[in-house]
A protein has these predicted regions:
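Sec-dependent signal peptide recognition
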Residues: 2-8
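Bacterial signal peptide processing site
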Residues: 19-21
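Acidic, glycine-anchored loop motifs typical of Ca2+
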Residues: 118-123
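Extracellular beta-sheet/turn segments enriched in Thr/Pro/Gly and aliphatic residues
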Residues: 133-150
Length: 150
């Protein structure tokens, strides 16, 4: 009897681990591609081609809370315009703090961490987002969102 129970328990554990693996794979498969095109005129030469684009999310109805990083991508470019593709996880709303419901509206925006002039610091002499033109809002439902740079 003990052997039968032990065999059933081991079989159950093996089956459960297979089910968990399938859930993990399906969650990965459900990630959404979000494309952002960075456009503008660069007055300076791009000496450092490597940078990082970060996608943030913040609840629409909550004021004065820090945004949550939901995806990031490293990129390389020598010229403008350029495009980056984020892999937005299917469960990205569960990452947002403070916690929100799946039905809550979320505002998405992008930021750059890019020392484009290669002087060792990210500052106003680099290619930066042009907030005077528009806030870098990202619409995850559209084919491509455009962000202005200067």
């Amino acid at each position: 009897m003990k052997k039968t129970i032990a065999v059933l328990m081991v079989s159950s554990l093996a089956f459960m681990s297979c089910m968990n693996q399938q859930k993990t794979n399906s969650a990965d498969a459900e990630s959404t591609k979000v494309t952002v095109e960075f456009v503008g005129n660069s007055n300076g030469e791009i000496k450092n081609k490597a940078g990082k684009a970060i996608l943030f999310a913040v609840p629409d109805q909550v004021a004065d809370v820090p945004a949550t990083e939901v995806a990031s991508v490293n990129f390389e470019t020598r010229s403008l315009p350029f495009t980056v593709n984020f892999d937005l996880p299917a469960n990205h709303k569960s990452l947002i703090k403070p916690e929100i419901k799946d039905t809550d509206r979320v505002h998405y925006y992008v930021s750059l961490d890019w020392d484009s002039d290669g002087n060792g610091t990210v500052d106003s002499t680099d290619v930066v987002i042009d907030y005077d033109q528009a806030f870098p809002t990202v619409d995850i439902g559209s084919a491509t969102s455009r962000v202005m740079l200067k």
